[in-house]
């Protein structure tokens, strides 16, 4: 017996949509949504394809996701070509199976079933889909959100289909994410010969006390919803490669994953104060990837928890751990934002896969969420 969720997932996987190339995935989704009465608005920016689709009016529940995937890596190590989906022992293999073409298929099929049962639903059901999430994320959801906000578009609830689960579908729901702030720091010294250090100024030596103090800072202790803020040095570069040259510059890149106990401005102020304390000559460039956001218990969280408890008979954990997602952009609209998707154990890996039965379960959960919020 065929399953529409699995069939659509397989069709999407066959389209090698390496970010930001959509490779025809959105056209496939749009065709299905048009047939059930959705209005489609293409919102492409640069090399990125996006669409905003809606049906009905009033209080709005949007389903958000991305069609792009990361590269497959060494294809010879896959049990099957990465863009030729195959099912083995109940597991559906293929690049994007878990992140996140399975979720996209579950969303579309859930919408089809929902509309068939509730053709005159009271609220508005919407889709926000992009092909630029895995790479730069500069022309995707963030641009669509900016355009929607500029025309005062309403968005009350948003379900992002990122693979949130860890062992069984629905065991973890993300109801927020930490902020992400990166510092690109250059410490300036004076290049010279290692035999004549008095004629040079070694930026590595200069920066060492600063870095020691930086890594020892306890930024906060987190709160009931977020773990403590984490700072990690990601890259350090200095020197010419020669053993007899004192470097003239030291480049250090470090990233903060910060909770709602802090703001990006507070972090910047403390780092700059520390640099001044150590009397360093420096240039700095900051990149704020996203602010922290949190969706407290309310209609959306309650609907998601209800759907999981109904179909999987487990109580999900509400967590804010992990990396950033496009939910950080959607939260700017004032919407309640929650992430619910399949198990994430194999995302971005060789032989990415998802339990086929989980996708069928996910579609039922999505449909129940629709029924609770916009039926």
From Swiss-Prot:
Domain of life: Bacteria
Cofactor note: Binds 2 Zn(2+) or Co(2+) ions per subunit.
Annotated residues for binding of Zn(2+) 2: 99, 134, 348
UniProt keyword terms in alphabetical order: Amino-acid biosynthesis, Cobalt, Diaminopimelate biosynthesis, Hydrolase, Lysine biosynthesis, Metal-binding, Zinc
EC number(s) per entry: 3.5.1.18
Catalytic reaction equation(s): N-succinyl-(2S,6S)-2,6-diaminopimelate + H2O = (2S,6S)-2,6-diaminopimelate + succinate
Binding, Zn(2+) 1: 66, 99, 162
Purpose: Catalyzes the hydrolysis of N-succinyl-L,L-diaminopimelic acid (SDAP), forming succinate and LL-2,6-diaminopimelate (DAP), an intermediate involved in the bacterial biosynthesis of lysine and meso-diaminopimelic acid, an essential component of bacterial cell walls.
Subunit structure: Homodimer.
Protein name as catalogued: Succinyl-diaminopimelate desuccinylase
Species annotation: Salmonella paratyphi C (strain RKS4594)
Gene symbol of the encoding locus: dapE
